[in-house]
């Protein structure tokens, strides 16, 4: 990747390719924006890149814990050629996620701010003509707590597949998901930011050569969960036309909570606020500085496994909630009722979702010895309650089912990681895909089974298809980073083609690609990796086991609580 303005070596190429002499300027409903042209090796047509375009008013002051408002207009030409700050978050976790997940050659310097409602645009369109290219809007992951748009470079996907790529930001953590469970702070602010960004795309993307009638939303982890939530929301009708969830769906128990009041009170107490009423808490928290809320975030120890406290009292994430606006009911209820946006939907998981990044780098599981006995596994499953929601009574049954077939403590550890991967991602993803299929929406599933050469040296060589691995293929990392293998380059070309075909037609299949079966009652899906082939019934046995276990638990008579009169 070269910037013509910076890289002398590419000057000749710039001239030869007829590189536009003036940088691109595009009209938006709020004012003009100035971008820059960036060339990708092997492509005659440069990509116009616009970084840090505001899609909403800065969510400061009285707009903290409030729905996003339209951006204010400007009369000058706004320079949108530098990366916007990422939304406020724990800087250490934010840096780590960016380092591990970026598809760039080197990570960009990260800044953080509460003023963060910006998006980046990559368009290969000839801006002198009114093109109508498919638009792909990327929603980043990070547990709704960390992450940012600029970690992910849309250049390769845009150039290779002739699509407009938009990467968006949304409020995170306390700023994005603080909820009192009533009208004082309903919550889901980060999801409402995502909706605002999609509205902005509808109003403006035509001027960037994009087709507002062909918008695909795609995201990974909490970004995949967000895509799935947006499909279920009445607010998003006609804002997008296809959807892709990579390793994250609306049924992730870790990212959804029904009762929010107790967590709101914990946050308020930690911030030194009174908790007499919701109004008092919200008023007090709005007066706090960004730094003070950051201190609260760090003290709350989100995104960490607590081995000491009562798992039922612990909180790993601030989450999506039922706010009556974005989500009228719980995701499971909306899915069961089949009343939501019936759009072509692709859902996928990776082979070892709980392989290394989540347990070792993010949540800090005590597994560095590389082995595990059954008793410890059962205890760890119970300590994982905040993210997997398995009751204490079920933990020995579950560990026996997964780990009982071997005495080898190394195998037991691997099987424990498989169990957590199924609970966190595998089972919810298959269940969501089945719901969409049953509702009549065209549905596709995949399992990604490949280890990118860009993986961290700290990661065990045996972990293939870890959480986030598919991003390197989807966003064309082999064309941006150095040192990719030939196999990896081919794989990324194929994956980008599948994803862009889906964005164009609602069907990933195309000439020269292995046939990807629709996810119908035969439950065909695609295994993507060094060998890419169709298979059937992804996680079928695991889903059956957990469904039966939870049904038995639900049918058990609850112990009646003694009520003092």
UniProtKB/Swiss-Prot annotation:
This is Liver carboxylesterase 1. SUPFAM superfamilies: alpha/beta-Hydrolases (SSF53474). It catalyses: a carboxylic ester + H2O = an alcohol + a carboxylate + H(+). A motif (Prevents secretion from ER) lies at residue 565. The lineage of its organism: Eukaryota, Metazoa, Chordata, Craniata, Vertebrata. The active site is at 221 (acyl-ester intermediate), 353 (charge relay system), 467 (charge relay system). Its EC number is 3.1.1.1. GO terms for cellular component: endoplasmic reticulum lumen. Disulfide bonds join 87-116, 273-284. Belongs to the type-B carboxylesterase/lipase family. Residues 1-18 form the signal peptide. It is found in: Endoplasmic reticulum lumen. Keywords: Disulfide bond, Endoplasmic reticulum, Glycoprotein, Hydrolase, Serine esterase, Signal. Pfam families: COesterase. Glycans are attached at residues 79, 389.
């Amino acid at each position: 990747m070269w910037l013509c303005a910076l890289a002398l070596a590419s000057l000749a190429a710039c001239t030869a390719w007829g590189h536009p002499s003036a940088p691109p300027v595009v009209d938006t409903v709020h004012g003009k924006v100035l971008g820059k042209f960036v060339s990708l090796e092997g492509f005659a047509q440069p990509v116009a890149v616009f970084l840090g375009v505001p899609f909403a008013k800065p969510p400061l002051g009285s707009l903290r814990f409030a729905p996003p408002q339209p951006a204010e207009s400007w009369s000058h030409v706004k320079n949108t050629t530098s990366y916007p700050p990422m939304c406020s978050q724990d800087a250490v976790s934010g840096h780590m996620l960016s380092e591990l997940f970026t598809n760039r050659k080197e990570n960009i310097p990260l800044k953080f701010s509460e003023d963060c409602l910006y998006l980046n645009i990559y368009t290969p369109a000839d801006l002198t003509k009114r093109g109508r290219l498919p638009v792909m809007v990327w929603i980043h992951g990070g547990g709704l707590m960390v992450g940012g748009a600029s970690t992910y470079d849309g250049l390769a996907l845009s150039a290779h597949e002739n699509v407009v790529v938009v990467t968006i930001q949304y409020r995170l953590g306390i700023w994005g998901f603080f909820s009192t469970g009533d009208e004082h702070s309903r919550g889901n602010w980060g999801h409402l930011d995502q909706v605002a960004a999609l509205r902005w795309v509808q109003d403006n993307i035509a001027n960037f050569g994009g087709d507002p009638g062909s918008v695909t939303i795609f995201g990974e982890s909490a970004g995949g969960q967000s895509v799935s939530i947006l499909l279920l929301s009445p607010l998003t009708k006609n804002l997008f036309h296809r959807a892709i969830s990579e390793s994250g769906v609306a049924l992730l128990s870790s990212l959804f909570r029904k009762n929010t009041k107790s967590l709101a009170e914990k946050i308020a107490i930690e911030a030194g606020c009174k908790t007499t009423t919701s109004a008092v808490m919200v008023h007090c928290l709005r007066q706090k500085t960004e730094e003070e809320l950051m201190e609260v975030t760090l003290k709350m120890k989100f995104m960490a496994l607590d081995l000491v406290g009562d798992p039922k009292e612990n909180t790993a994430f601030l989450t999506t909630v039922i706010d009556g606006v974005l989500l009228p009911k719980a995701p499971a209820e909306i899915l069961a009722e089949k009343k939501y946006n019936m759009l072509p939907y692709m859902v996928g998981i990776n082979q070892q979702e709980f392989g290394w990044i989540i347990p070792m780098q993010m949540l800090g599981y005590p597994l560095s010895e590389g082995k595990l006995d059954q008793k410890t596994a059962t205890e760890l499953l119970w300590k994982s309650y905040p993210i997997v929601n398995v009751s204490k009574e079920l933990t020995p049954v579950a560990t026996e089912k997964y780990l009982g077939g071997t005495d080898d403590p190394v195998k037991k550890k691997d099987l424990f990681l498989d169990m957590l991967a199924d609970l966190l991602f595998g089972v919810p993803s298959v269940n969501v895909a089945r719901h969409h299929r049953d509702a009549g929406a065209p549905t596709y599933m995949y399992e990604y089974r490949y280890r990118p050469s860009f993986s961290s040296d700290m990661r065990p060589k045996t972990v293939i298809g870890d959480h986030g691995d598919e991003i390197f293929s989807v966003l064309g990392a082999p064309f941006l980073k150095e040192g990719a293998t030939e196999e990896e380059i081919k794989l990324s070309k194929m994956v980008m083609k599948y994803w862009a075909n889906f964005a164009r037609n609602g069907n990933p299949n195309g000439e020269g690609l292995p046939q990807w079966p629709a996810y119908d009652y035969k439950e065909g899906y695609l295994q993507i990796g060094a060998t890419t082939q169709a298979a059937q019934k992804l996680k079928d046995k695991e889903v059956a086991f957990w469904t039966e276990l939870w049904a038995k638990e639900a049918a058990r008579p609850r112990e009646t609580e003694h009520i003092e009169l």
